[in-house]
Structure formats: structure tokens, C-alpha cells
Amino acid sequence: GWLAWKRAPLPPRSALAPLAMVAVGCIIGFPWLTSIAMRSLPAAHGAVLVGILPLATAVFGALLAGEKPSAGFWIMASVGSALVIGFALGQSGGSLQPADLAIFLAVLLAAMGYAAGGRLSQTLGGQQTICWALLLSAPVLLPLVGWLCWQDAPRLAAAGAAAWTGFAYVSVFSMFIGFFFWYRGMALGGVARVGQVQLVQPFLSLLGAALVLGEALAWPTVVFAIAVIAVVGAGRKMQVKRAENRRLS
């Protein structure tokens, strides 16, 4: 729909491999593996995922996008990830479970998709990058979704308004419109540098839960949040050399 509305041209052949990485990493692999893992893991493990993902994104930014972060950047990224992981493990009692393997694989796939999409957005644009990746994944997802809807028809019929509202939000914003801004930011600021913003996400989620749901906001959460924000701010000042932008053909 968006591609037709904008009359976007077909992507060049050289864009197919990065688009496939986005499709496999961000559209199929990451949501599928995390949904499997979080069935048996406590919610705090989701913060572990977010804590590892920025560092993994920086690694793939170096591998796929040709970026060269300085030693200072790697130190700040590692410290930030360690803070978030330590906070999450402290909330969950410090235990790891077999389903954490799915979390680890999800992190690798998402980091690959972020880096490939961020690099591609420099020439294709953030909107076209996610739209073409969604279209590329459609032949795999449509039959699978149709089969799942047929299998779970009674559950779908019994789902309430809150469930459908959450599903619509994730579908429209998290998996579509959000990527417009995410890939645009990576195209402007670089994969490694912009990816570090994810470190603040767990604490913003806890703040939102406190404001919207009335959940208690403990003082260790505030301390960790301030420390992570300070690390992200310091990391933004560290040098990251970016590869020259080459047009796709």
C-alpha cells in the first residue's frame, strides 16, 4: 500500500541481500523467537535481551555497515550493556534458563536486521527499506498466518478488545511505522551510535508502567536508569568512523 501510494521504484538487485536480512532478522526471526522464549521466561529477561541488543547491533554495524567505532565507544557500549543485564538479572534472581538460548538467537537476528537495514536506508530510505522487507517476507508469512488463524479460530473469536488493540498497536507501530524513524535515525547517525539508545528502553518501559498502570518505581531502578543514561550520553561523544555511502545499482 505505502509503496504503491508513493510509486516507489523496484529496489536494485544489490539491495535484495540486505532486505532479506531485515526480513529474516526483524520481521520473522526476532518476533518468533522472543514470543517462544517469553512463554516460559520472567518478564525481566526481556530487559536482558534489550541490554545485549545494542552491543550486538554495534558489532553487526562494524561487520555489515563498515563502521569503525573507537575503543572508547566499545567500552561505553559494554558498560551500558553490563548495567542493563545486571539490573535485569537482579530483578529475576540472577538465574538463566534454557529458553535464554532463544533470546540469544533473537538478539543476533535483530542486530543483523538493524545493521543491514540501517546501512540500506542511507540509499533506499527508511520507509522503503521496511516496506520492501515486509513484502519480501509476505510469501512466507501469509500462508503461515492463515494456517495459524485456522488452527486457533476459537481463541481468536474469544479474544477481547484489549488483546486486539495490543495486536493492532504492535502490528502498525512496532513492526511498521516505528521502523520508519528507526532506520531514518540509523541512516543519519550511524548504526552503532543510534543503536545505543535501546539501552534506555527498559527503564522507559518501567516509567510508563508506573505512570499508566500505577506500578511502584523502586529507587534501584531510578539509580540504574540515571547510570545508563549517563553511559549513553558519554558513548555519543566517542568517535565512530562511518563507511562512505555507496549508491546501490
Language-model segments: which ranges?
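Specific transmembrane alpha-helical segments of multi-pass solute transporters/efflux pumps
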Residues: 1-50, 86, 171-189
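Hydrophobic transmembrane alpha-helices of multi-pass small-molecule transport proteins
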Residues: 22, 60, 69-91, 108-110, ...
